[in-house]
Amino acid sequence: MTQTTRSVPTAFEITRRENCFQGFYKLDKLYLRHELFDGGTSKEISRELFVRHDAVCVLPYDAKRDEVVLIEQFRVGAVQKTGNPWLIELVAGLIDKDEQPEEVAHREAEEEAGLVFGALWPITKYFPSPGGSDEFVHLFMGQCDSQGAGGLHGLESEGEDIRVTVWSFDDAMQAVADGRIINAATIIALQWLALNRAEIRGLWS
């Protein structure tokens, strides 16, 4: 990578913001200018922004058995891109106002998978699609007992129909390699576990 001594741009100005749609999610149109890498300022540009709650995703891991607990559910976003919109995913949920990410992790583990976490390990935080969305993801690993995990879960009031499955670590990684797991947070979390598995097993076993 070519190194440069030029400073990174930091200045921007939002000149106008319009709401285009308001439902469970929101779509806004922003008009803005921002500093350029050459030191100048851009002309006014417009960008559509998908506004949504920040999210928490958790990989439940039983270090003693070297097993992960994953969920499957129907995802409307995958309807037109794949022949099977039932995706293999992590336990996940949206952060409500005044909630801490850790609270969401524990709540969703119980609601979506019937699990109680003994501890949480922060993996990373990231923007999944910052070119058009402000969603920010908090990614954790949760210490769990996988024995007896499984079955159908989810809140009927939210239309959730969730199947919980237990995987050996090796089988889960093979599902990533085979393209059966195509959810980004799940892939990131499993690859992180692959890099840190020995340490985690030493601490949580």
Enumerate the predicted regions with their spans.
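Nudix hydrolase/Nudix homology domain
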Residues: T2-V8, F12, R16, E72, ...
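Acidic pyrophosphate-coordinating catalytic loop
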Residues: N19-G23, G39, V79-K81, Y126-H138
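Acidic, metal-coordinating catalytic segment for phosphate/diphosphate chemistry
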Residues: C20-R65
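Active-site-adjacent beta-strand/loop module that shapes the phosphate/pyrophosphate-binding cleft
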Residues: L32-L36, S129-G150
